[in-house]
Amino acid sequence: MGLTVEQPPTPTLVQGFQRSWQTLTDALVSLPGSQRRHYATLLLTRLIAVAALQQRGYLGGDEWYLHNQFGQSQQRELDGFFSQVLQPLCQQGFTLPAEERPPALRQRLGPLPFVPTGPFRFTELDQRWGHVPLPDAAFEPTLHWLADLAAAAPAGLDAGLGMLLEQAVNGYDGVAMATPAPLLGALCDRTIHATLLDRAEALTNHRYRSTEQLLKELSPAEAGTLLTELGQLTLLDPACGSGRFLVAALNQLMELALGLRAIATQNSAKTIPNWAKPSPNNPTLGLYQHLATHALYGLDLWPPAVELARLQLWLQGVQHTSQPTELTALPDLTLTVLQGNALVGLVRVDDERFDQVPPRRGAKDPEQAVPLQGNLLQPLIADSYQSVLGERQVRLEHYRSQTQLLAEVGSVPAYAQADFLRDRLDELDAIAQGKLTHLLWSEGSQQLGLRVPDPTGDRPTRPLNQTDVDATQPFHWGFYFHQQRRDQGGFDIVLSHFPRGAVEATQVGFVERYATLFEQKNVTPSTFRHNRQPVLTIDHDLTQAWAEYRGQFTWLSNYLRRSDQYPHSSLGPDGLSQNRLFWSRLFLERSLQLLRPGGRCGVLLDPFWAQSNSAPLRHWLQRQTDLATVLDLSNHQKLWPDIPSRTTLCALWLRHQGPTQGSPYAAFSKPNTALAPEALGGVLQRLIHPTG
């Protein structure tokens, strides 16, 4: 039950993962292009989760459970593994209490723990595509890869996945890079550790040089107070990708909590908050539960990345269990690791305008809705925005308390009640999302005058409609994180690796979106990527699809320029709008909107400081924040093996209170100044402790 120690992936493991992922995706050819990778990733996360449970000995002590079930299914019938093993395992096995499972299933699948949350949950993808037959061959590469992974990471699969999955997600539509461990450690130090030092300074009137010094000099009473404050911190990764940064943050917070608890215990257990008190049988599970539920939040636009991030945090929880029954205590990570567009959505909600929005056309009429303990939809139709926020908080707390009860009693009534309460929460969220997106559409179409290119219409452009806005998958920070903004002024910490490149249509995204059309035209993705212009010249339908796809980015770029959300990253030095917008600059500006005054931010992003077109952003940062470090790095000395030497990256950490004193900029980006992997850690330590 120790903290995860990462292992760099071997080339064999990297290739095995890619082969597994692609084989599952290719087997789902009957699905729409945009959903193939998502469902393949969901199935892959479930296979990894089963492998983690068998490695812990939770599946009847059979460490080869998956492989044995695969072999037995082939003896019964060919191509029956998906329909006869994996689907029943998830939908009638792990997610049902033992007494609810069909007897024939219990006999075939053996003793299984009850896992009410996590990768096995029933999803909309299962409802739509769970009936699609999949051949055994679709799973064979994954089973081979999982065997290799278990051999490489005998202490826990999570140790071998962090860098591998980060590399895979980053490489899907960009450069396949994984953050070097010293760099990730430095970002955690300058955010999580620095925030704890800020709290300690406020408590003791003394600035400690490091958390090591802090833990040596704290009194038990002070440690108990700081432990309470540590449990109140909130950390956001607004572009969480595979979840590696969230896992690193979890491990750092766990380590600090254990250190503070050990000191506080010397005085009296009374000084330790309830969430941090060790249980007799498990000293760390309670810490994990609290931090994963209340401290860590992630968001990503790409659904497969969200599935992988949830998986990685769930695997951490599995490592903190000591027996199968404790799996019921693992939190529902779908409440904290979310899917949506961090850059598009309302950060502040106008109460009066929300209250004036009528119900979405096509939504259920509340008078006709099936009553469940009264009319569940009525509060959103009749009540004010503030009432809706209050109702959401009540439903959220009811659901969390019910899942906690489920962890304690494990009964069928508790399990059914938890499902019911989650449905109530989802209903409320869905209707609020529709009304908030309507407000966003109204702003874009009426106030900003946005129009969408229309390659098939009589005119070059058409009015923006709400379907266009829905397609961007807006995330309304002001609604989903209202409590953090109201009570704390925002998140305490932002820790992230922002998306790279410019805001523009990509070939990878286009091929995935229109995969079915490519198959109808008998054009392979590689053919399009290497011969885009000739293909578009020849085929009218693909040309039209490409124009429609690009048009969605055109209006989105115009929104990002014209809205009042990004004045510093969308303007050039002459005060005019930038010709190109860059994802990472927009994310940086958004992050500071979400960070509380005095909060800390540590991120990786595209280099920008030395570029002339970044002057408005640079000057604003110097005025509004205390920029400690802006560090440009290049790959000329192979910080990231196997990717081009021209690859560059910027590491930045700051505190959200300005102004900046002195110059924070340092560059190791030219061939003659680039850092080798073994030199990176030393340079980072000198930046963190400049007088050391």
Named regions from a protein language model:
Residues 63-67, 199-228, 255-291, 317-335:
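Flexible phosphate/Mg2+-sensing switch loops adjacent to catalytic phosphate-binding sites
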Residues 629-651:
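Class I S-adenosyl-L-methionine
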Residues 175, 348-351, 505-507, 642, ...:
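Short conserved micro-motifs at the rims of enzyme active sites and ligand-binding pockets
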Residues 309:
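Conserved SAM-binding loop
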Residues 1-254, 298-305, 340-343, 431-522, ...:
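Preference for the N-terminal adenyl/adenosyl cofactor-binding alpha/beta module
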Residues 648-660:
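Conserved beta strand-loop-helix elements of the APE1-like EEP
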Residues 286-299, 329-355:
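P-loop NTPase motor core
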Residues 244-283, 345-402, 430, 444-631, ...:
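SAM-dependent methyltransferase catalytic-core segment centered on the flexible catalytic loop
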